Amino acid sequence: MNYNCEIQNRNSKNVDNQVSLPPIQVLFNSIEKRSMPELAFSNIEYSHGNLRSSTEEQNYPAPVLLPQHHSIAYPAINSGGTSTTATPTASTVETSKTSSSAMDTQSQYGSSKKSKSASDDAKPCYKSAPIYEIINKEKDAGAQYNRPFSDFVESKSRRKQNSGRRSNLPKETVQILNTWLLNHLNNPYPTQQEKRELLIKTGLTKIQLSNWFINVRRRKIFSDYYTLVNSIPNDNANNTPVERVQNVSAYHNTLSATNNTMYDATSTCSTDYELSKRFAHAPVTRRKKLIDRLEELKKLSNPDMN
């Protein structure tokens, strides 16, 4: 009862002692400028070389605020029953700013940690070669192998269309080469100096010039071979030795006349040594067949070897 009476007495009094606060700008200007408190883990340095794998748990120290001595303002109830707020001091405003900045720092740190963990899950950091690159390469290779057969057929047809047909040499170039060949029928193998001169005159490459001479020599050898085969006399078992000698002499006369007419490279060949010396530098291309033809030519030109 006494307590209720006391409250009624307080309410009956005039409320003259209410607190009036100055503008907020004046209060902010009156606050002393202080440096922000440092976090306890700010001096810890993290290097990229010491980063651990994403499979391991990364425990970072939680931010700890330095102790601050401040007073907390609570709302006060005056004698008239109305609640009033006490005047905020400089320490109170500074404490509120410090707590808000600390909360912002913690939230930023937490968000950065979450984003980092998400990026680590998406693209893990391996000590060796990244496995995801190897997997992607294998997938690309598998996709190439799984291409339909029609694509390969189309690409092959395109390559055939792009590769033009091999054209013949110009007439002027062939005339220059034939002139040189007629002047060197006994030995149709140009020296290095002669090759350089022919390259300058014809404008061909070394490969083109070599291929032309290889083809020409091959044609002459085969031509000589078939000419000899067709001109061999048929030796019957009934022929006498005298008749065989006459046939051989007639065969040699026919061979010499044929060689002089066709300007063959073996026209002046009289011995096996000269023949082997003349064709010592036979081309490597289809060498087996050329050697076989040469051996048969030797046997046909020298009946004594049979």
Curated annotation (Swiss-Prot):
Residues 79-96 have a biased composition (Low complexity). Coiled coil: none annotated. Residues 75-123 are annotated as: Disordered. GO terms for cellular component: nucleus. Residues 162-224 bind DNA. Belongs to the TALE/CUP9 homeobox family. This is Homeobox protein CUP9.
